[in-house]
Structure formats: C-alpha cells, structure tokens
C-alpha cells in the first residue's frame, strides 16, 4: 500500500484518489495569479493541523510578507514556529537588513546550490519536517536554465532521502505550454498545473494533474476557486471547451 499525504485542500485529494504518495516531489506549475503560492501554503498549513511539521522556502517574497499573506487566510504560522513545528527558510533577503536578526535559516548566496541544500537540510533535521515547499524553484535556475533539471534532481535526492513530501512551485509565463524550465518535468514525481483562462470575457481558474507517480488520478481539467479560506477544487465538475460541466 502506498502511504499518502493528504493535501487537505477541499476536493483535491479526491482528484488524487486519496492524496499525494509519500516522498513524492510535485511540480506545481502555473502562470502569474493562478494560486500557486496559496495552494502550497494551504498544503503546509493543513499538514500542521495533522501534526506534520513543515518548511516554506521563500525565494520570491520576503518571509515577513509570506507570514502576512498566510495569516490573511487564517493560517497564522508564528505559534508553530515558536513550537518548532514550522520553519521559514529565507532565500530572498540574502540576510540583508533586519532579516538576519529574526530569521533562523538564511541562504546567503543563491548561486551556491550546495549552501541552499545545506540550509534546507539543517531546517528539515531541526524540526523533523514532513512537508516542504520551495516557492519558487524557478528562481534557482532563472539565470542558468540549462541547470534546471540537475538542480531539481539534487533537491529531490535530498528531500526524498529525508522522507519529506514536497511541492516545488514553478513559474511559467502566460500562454506558455511547458512546465517551467527545460527538462524539469522529467525530474519530478508529479505535476499539477494551475491555469487562468479568459473565457467569454471572464477569467476562470482550473487545474489538471499531469502526472503523479504511485497513484492513479483524475485525467480531467477541474475548476477551482480561491476563497477567503483558501482554495476549493470541484472534483465533480470539469472545464472543457470553455464551459463548466457537472460530472
């Protein structure tokens, strides 16, 4: 039996036929505004509610901003940080300014993937993490796309070895067909793609599970909403040819 990690996102575990297989590294790919960060933060928060410690690696936003964004959905992680159940890895500020006073885990040189991995590994050990989010992994190879797959594989080796189940947020530009970075889709166990499409003059959100090692899953494109409590996915609805149909 494959052990599964529940995302806890309403509707999502149904689409994944029970959740993400344990130790999988999932690429969460999408354009701007599709809800990638919210999805990954909700995954971590729900883990905390299930007693699974988690780590958020902030590469795109200041850690303070990330905490504020999460708190807007009612996901206040500070208590869990104090209890040693949640850790933020600051890979955004490089320790410039006030961060070095109150962030425990700081990556100073993003071009040094070994430093990045060492800081992450330390954080995982310290809190015995079960879930890890890297937001976004694209930042690690934005200036050296040829390294994308190699970087993904290095990270995956470390994370799977520690027993963590992970989400790598991957940015793609509007209308781009791939998953962000050459070959990255071959280096991961799963791919979930979030989309925002203009249909009849209105933006509609949908997601599709492109692949997921270790489990069957829905092959359909499902609509989802972002509410004040986070993401809700509709497993009983499908988006096709611009229209939403009940299954």
Swiss-Prot record:
It holds the Pfam family ATPase. The keyword ATP-binding applies. One of its GO terms (molecular function) is ATP binding. Residues 3-247 form the KaiC domain. Signal peptide: none annotated. Keywords: ATP-binding, Nucleotide-binding. CDD domains: KaiC_arch. Transmembrane segments: none annotated. The keyword Nucleotide-binding applies. ATP binds at residues 30-37. Belongs to the UPF0273 family. HAMAP family: UPF0273. This is UPF0273 protein PF1931. It comes from Pyrococcus furiosus (strain ATCC 43587 / DSM 3638 / JCM 8422 / Vc1).
């Amino acid at each position: 039996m494959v052990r599964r990690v529940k995302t806890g996102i309403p509707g999502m575990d149904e689409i994944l036929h029970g959740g993400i297989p344990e130790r999988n590294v999932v690429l969460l790919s999408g354009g701007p505004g599709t809800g990638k960060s919210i999805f990954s933060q909700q995954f971590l928060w729900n883990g905390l509610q299930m007693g699974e410690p988690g780590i958020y690696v902030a590469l795109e936003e200041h850690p303070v901003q990330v905490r504020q964004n999460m708190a807007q959905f009612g996901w206040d992680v500070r208590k869990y940080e104090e209890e040693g159940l949640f850790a933020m890895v600051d890979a955004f500020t490089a320790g410039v300014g006030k961060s070095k006073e109150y962030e425990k885990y700081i990556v100073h040189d993003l071009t040094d993937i070994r430093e990045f991995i060492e800081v992450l590994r330390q954080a995982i050990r310290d809190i015995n993490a079960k879930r890890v989010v890297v937001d976004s992994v694209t930042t690690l190879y934005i200036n050296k796309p040829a390294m994308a797959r190699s970087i993904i594989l290095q990270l995956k080796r470390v994370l799977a070895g520690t027993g963590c189940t992970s989400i790598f947020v991957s940015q793609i530009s509007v209308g781009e067909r791939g998953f962000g970075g050459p070959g990255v889709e071959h280096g991961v166990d799963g791919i979930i793609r979030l989309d925002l499409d203009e249909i009849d003059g209105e933006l509609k959100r949908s997601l599709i599970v492109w692949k997921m090692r270790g489990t069957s899953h829905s092959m359909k494109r499902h609509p989802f909403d972002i509410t004040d409590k986070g993401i809700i996915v509709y497993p009983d609805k499908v988006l096709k040819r611009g229209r939403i149909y009940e299954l």
